[in-house]
Amino acid sequence: MGDREAVLLEALSRCGLRGLSQAWVDSVWELDFTETEPLDSRIEAEITENGLETFSSLHENLLAFASEDPENSRSVWLLFSENDICRNSLVALLSHFIQAAANKKANAIQRILALNAAGLYFLLLEIPGSVANQVFHPVLFDKSVNALEKCWPRDPNASRKRKKDTLKSSQGDNRGGRKRPRPPRRDEQEMEDLSEEEQDEEEVYFSTRDLMHIRDSIFLVLKNFLRLLPKFSLKEKPQSVLHCIQIFINLTSFESVPQEMPFSDAVSVNHMKYVPELAYHGLWLLCLPIHGEGNQTVRRLFQRLLSVILMMKGGEGSNSALLVISPPVISARNQAIRFISFLVNELKEGTIPVLNILLQHICVKFPDKADYRVYAAQALVKLMENLPNAEYAIFIEWLYKYSKNSKISYRVFALEVVVALLDLPEREADVSLPHENLNFLQHKFLLQHMVFSRCSDKAPTVRSKALSCLAQCLEKNSTTAIDGVQELLQGSSCRTVFGTNITETTGNGTVYASNANEATTHPQKTMATLKIIEVSDTGDTLSSDGKEVLTMLRYRAGDEKTNVRKSALQVLVNVLKCHLIPCSSEDLSTLQDRCRDPAVSVRKQALTSLTELLLAQPHSVLIQKAWLTGLIPVVLDTESSVQEKALECLDQLLLQSITHYKRFKQDDERQKLTWDLLTLLTSESQDLSRYLTKAFHLWSKQDKFSSTFITNLISHTETEHTAPAWMILSKVAGSSPKLDYTKILQSWERVSRQTDADINTTGHILCVIGHIAKHLPADTRTHLIDHVKSWLKEFKSSPEVISPAVEALQKLCHAQTDKPEDVQDLLNDVCGEIVSACEHHISSVVMADCKDEPLDQDLLVKHLFTLGEVAQLCPAKVEKRVLLLVQSILASSVTTEQNSCHSDAEDPPVSQPLSQFKGSNMPSLIRAHAFITLGKLCLQHEDLAKKCIPALARELEVCDDVAIRNNVIIVICDLCIRYTTMVDRYIPNVSVCLRDRDPFIRKQTLIMLTNLLQEEFVKWKGSLFFRFVSVLVDPDPEIAKFGEFCLVHLLLKRNPVMFSQHFIECIFHFNCYEKHEKYNKFAQTKRERTLFSLKGKENKDKRMKIYKFLLEHFTDEQRFNLTTKISHNVLACFVDGILPIDMEANELLSDIFDIMSSKEIKLSAMRSKPGEDVGADDDEMAMANAVMQAAQKKLISQVQKKNFVENIIPIITSLKGFLEQHRIPAVRDLMNYLREMMQDYRDEIKDFFAADKQLAAELEYDMKKYEEQLEREQEENVQNPPSAESTGSPKGSPRAVNAISSPRSPNAPKSPLSTNAQTPGGAAPCTPITTPRVSILKGQGPRPRQMSLSTLAILNSARKAAQDNKKQRSKSIGAQPSTPSPARTTSSKQVTFRSEDQQSDSSLVGRMISTPDVTIENVTFGAGVSYISASQTPLSGRRGSIGSHEKERDVLCIMSPDKPAPQPRKWNVESPVQRRSIRQRISGKAPLKPSN
């Protein structure tokens, strides 16, 4: 025993404790180890020289005292006292070395010494009696623990790496609307970089050996510390516990562990080999009861592990940063999750509440970036596995309410969690679980209530995520998912709760998010420890049925956001694939429409979805047709990737399964599907086969068609697949290698002899012959030429076969010789015979005198059609007689001519009918085909075209037969390509057919005009544009939809300014307003005006539909310019007096104000909320885009506000006064526009009116009265629904209730109010005895404007005072309530009193409102009510009878009887110079002349 003590004393003596100054020791303790004076350099050098050995020896000797039983051994503290060794000196010395390691410049020896010193300090604490001897000091303890981390050398580039490798947390900075911090100045940044470089230069270099020694020292000291923890209680030292937790957590990622760490209490520290293992063991030891009762330590531990799980670095709030996702980071996260699970299993019930809180905080603090969000959701689900069923159900209930929080990112995260939960097996219910919680254990609940309810979320990202989750669940074919969706589709009680509050009460503040229907984000405060996050449910329950589910899916397939549409398609297809509902035409139509979606990704998804659905249900003919209709036209897609996808799907289903007929099996579903699809292409869907030509052309470039493929096809030509096999052969023959022509020629020989051969098959065979003509021997070609010619001359085939036959004949002749002259000679010989045969038969029919013989119409049609086809190949063989014969067939009958002459006498026709042959009475079928033939002849004979084109245009007007009008349209449009200048003047005649009574003609005209406009054979001249866009309101919705497609996808792309150039004139044209000097000045007949007129209130909705459609496809620049143009070129004309303000202008102005108030005219940056959906965006660029969008919106908003204030407000305010003055109902729409604008530009409007407070007060008063009027109307509409008589009454502003004729429109309709003001006996409405004179001074700014008394109380007072003071004469104005009830309009009198002075004196026009022209006694105006000049006030009709002249001249000025008597009115004397300056200032802001 004595030897051991002697050795210890020897080791202590080598530490030089006796040489330490007592003053230095005392200062170290007094300063609480925070600051120290430098140690005597001699003593430090002496210890450092043999420091490692000294500290190791001391550690070894002290360890014996720590490990022995204190009862059986002598106390070391007694030994210190007996030998006069000051323990404070030893502790102070150790602290000096521990402190030295904190310096970045510390070398390897200093760091190792620091670790050894920290180990010695831990050993001193481990020795019994250390607390009583006051060895423990919290600061030194924390520094010793800190040494475990600080002694490890930091990477010299760590500071620079941190900036690159960490990402700013999207949820960390929750400062709401505060300004962003000022970026560092460039010079400051450069200085910081220089200082960092200097520090880097001063960094000490560590060799590998040094690093190994330091690592080993850390490992040994950490083991010593872990030996201390079970013995040394930290229960009273919570800050030290917290510090230990943080250091241990940092050490868990100190080095990589090759295998999965076993977390177990049974594992000995001595068996651990890695620092992270020791660190986790240390965390486990800190959770023991010795260091704290309850779950406080666990709570602190979980809070610190939260950042590891979320892969974040730094503290919470604005200081947090995201770690780059890497294998070490993911490994640390996984270890933390496993350790938490270990703790929960070990500590049981005590940790469950804390785990529940941790789960809640994961939901609230996850990084809002796609990858991090997924990892956080997976971590949450793994931790949820540790919850018992009861707690699991409670948390799911919390999560359900959380999923409806107002923050978009929360709702998206809830969906991520649900997706991960659905991957786990469903939990089985316990007997002890309350019945109301059973639902929360079921996957069905997650699917129906948490996924499906979010499919209609107002945030696009949430909708997209929910639909994507739903699609994933169905794709996995899990029974629970399918059952859950099945219940939804069957309309079981699916309840959706809206309205959830999340409240988190902490010591520092509260996190609060109000309503799920308000996507607002509230600040999140930093919390000291984990606190429970409470979620309250305040919403109503809504149920949905199966029809609503399908309706929702179809609606979402047309959502404004690309990702939502794409996800909706996936869900819809998976629902159909799983046979949860039968395929309906509506569902398939939705999929077909998405094949033409504007977004590339949606088009690709639609192609994939349709193909998957067809493969899942290959026997459904409905799906087969939908697949063909949706997919085949996409081969013409302008986007190459979409085109390639379509070709891939076509190749997969149409080509790959074509094998030799010998290997064809009926039970092979893929082969059967291929031939079913090809058969449809030759029958019901044969119109789509023309698109296949493009596909086969593209495939031919890829050498898709081998000789084996051709052989396989030919093997099917004499089987039940004959028609589709020949159809495919006709497409591939032109690009395929040489074929076995024998089989093809034999088929032609056989088919040509059959009288009942299939038309399509015959045409395809002839097409194949044309393709292989150049490969045939010369004698075979000669034989075929004669054969085809003879076959045509028999005239037994229908027109559908004649065209391919003539084309084959042409190709055979071209292949026969190489010289063009010889080819034409051959064609003249061959085709000349056919022309002669046609001429002979047509002549015999036309010239026949016998009327009794029945006409063989089919035969004549065949001759006419053949003539038109072959005449184009040999124009020299077509004689004038042939032309006259065709014209004679087309000559109109006498009856038709006479009718047409009287049909439109006032508008002489621009063209004359064919008049050479009168009395021709050919059937419509013959005439229809004859027009086609004539058109083909005109293509080769220009003189004939000059003669026939006017007659063709006239035929469109007079002919009633649909087939004839259709063919004439086709002929005129084809001739327009050949003779553009000649036909151009007759394009208006063709465009009239857009209003044809037959839908087929309207659509055909639309197609033909679109083709001409695309190729620019026709320009947008005259009324063509306005007639074209009128198709948007076609009564047939299919035609209207097709018109939208033509305008947007075909024409607007070629001419992006097309809509903006014609927009203003659209307003004039559709309102039939022709008084403007520039707009709507093209020539039209009365019939054309009537056909295309959209004038009147009954067509208001149609006009607005056109306007809004055009505006939706404007660019922002075009929208911005349009507002200014409307103000300067239209509204200013009314203000300047260039255009009269009358009832004819009412609808025009009403449309303009509705357009200017519409959301479509607002700039896109102003309509959308920047960043409203960025919170959950998967794209890193989304955040940057949101910032750009916000800056763009701010800039555009400033420019738009400036434009509004400088260019629009002056004109609008001036025009408002004029409209009120003339009682034009459009003033109501103006007020609505002002109300909309004042919401956006209230401050700017106040600034503008700062110089004219009178005008500002009047405008504010008017707006107030207008809003009161709207409220009254809404209340009356609820209480008393409007009758048929009152619904037609135009509503004006508070000042413009009665609309009457103005002097500029004497024939304008009277106000509907005058109709209501009739006597019960039906007397005619009263009219004013004089017409008020209107003086519009050109170039003058807005005059002082007049206000009406629109308050019902004042009106009642007026009536009462009128009975008492009939003979009193003064100035006033009578007014009515804006929306009189039927009872009131029939029982009260409308009285307008005027004095003689008012009727004659026009000098009062410019008088200020506050200056009386005569003395007023005992009467005054109500507060805020202006005077309205007599010469500007129209008279209202007076109900009752047309009374005496004296009664009508009675005048009364009144005020409310209960008002106090007014003070005598003062004169408002104002300098004319001042008044002139004010007017000039106002007019200077309003350029009232049209700008060019």
UniProtKB/Swiss-Prot annotation:
GO terms for biological process: cell division; meiotic chromosome condensation; mitotic chromosome condensation. The keyword Cell division applies. Residues 1377-1388 have a biased composition (Low complexity). It comes from the Eukaryota. It comes from Xenopus laevis (African clawed frog). Keywords: Cell cycle, Cell division, DNA condensation, Mitosis, Nucleus, Repeat. Component of the condensin-2 complex, which contains the smc2 and smc4 heterodimer, and three non SMC subunits, ncapg2, ncaph2 and ncapd3 that probably regulate the complex. This is Condensin-2 complex subunit D3-L.
